[in-house]
């Protein structure tokens, strides 16, 4: 199982654009879901400006209700315990949500609302900055240390790949803008040259 996840991480590395990356990440979520026999696997992006989490990716098992449309703006105030843990780089491993009812009451309400009984969640980082987290709902596995460590690696890797692609696309946009400006300038110079020739 671990090897299959690692293979998909290599595929994510090879993504050439945002569309390929999105498809590769979606496949990764499906693989994690299959390996853990879970009901749902998803990614939340952290919007530090608005202090909200936004559900950006979701994979659901058979006959499992999707929640992505309802989770586009989860206020950080509703996830204080998780946010603090993720910022420390800690993962969340919950074998039974009833055991954390008093420890994290806000998160408990969110989990119960989605019919979640057990949970694994781990942060996504880029250069020590929290970018979001990956969640695995109702997994049917033993939470082995090696597997949890692998999920942590996945979180860090996704953060790096997504940010690198974002910066690459931004650079390409700036280059295209610069090329257009130079083209417009050359066209204007040619036009002025023709005018001057006609005038003379």
Language-model segments: which ranges?
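Signal-transducing coupling segments at domain and membrane junctions
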Residues: 95-118
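Amphipathic alpha-helical "output/dimerization" segments
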Residues: 126-129, 142-173
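A short, aliphatic-rich beta-strand micro-motif
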Residues: 117-125
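Short regulatory alpha-helical segment in sensory/regulatory domains of signaling proteins that mediates
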Residues: 10-20, 28-37, 43-48, 111-112, ...
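GAF sensory/regulatory domain recognition
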Residues: 30, 42-87, 129
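PAS/Per-ARNT-Sim sensory domains
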Residues: 77-81, 99-107, 173
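Signal-transmission linkers at sensory-effector interfaces
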Residues: 1-23, 34, 170-194, 198
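Short glycine-/small-residue motifs
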Residues: 132-133
């Amino acid at each position: 199982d671990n090897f299959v996840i690692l293979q998909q991480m290599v595929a994510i590395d090879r993504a050439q654009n945002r569309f390929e990356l999105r498809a590769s990440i979606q496949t990764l979520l499906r693989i994690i879901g299959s390996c853990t026999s879970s009901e749902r696997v998803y990614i939340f992006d952290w919007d530090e400006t608005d202090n909200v989490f936004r559900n950006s990716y979701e994979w659901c098992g058979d006959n499992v209700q999707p929640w992505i449309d309802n989770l586009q703006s989860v206020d950080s105030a509703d996830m204080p315990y998780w946010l603090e843990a993720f910022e420390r780089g800690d993962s969340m491993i919950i074998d039974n949500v009833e055991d954390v009812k008093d420890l994290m009451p806000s998160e408990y309400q969110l989990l119960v609302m989605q019919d979640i009984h057990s949970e694994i969640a781990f942060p996504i980082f880029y250069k020590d900055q929290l970018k979001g987290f990956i969640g695995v709902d109702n997994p049917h596995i033993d939470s082995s240390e090696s597997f949890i460590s692998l999920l942590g690696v996945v979180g860090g890797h996704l953060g790096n790949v997504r940010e690198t692609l974002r910066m690459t696309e931004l650079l390409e946009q700036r280059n295209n803008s610069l090329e257009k400006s130079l083209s417009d300038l050359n066209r204007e110079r040619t036009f002025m040259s023709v005018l001057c020739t006609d005038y003379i």
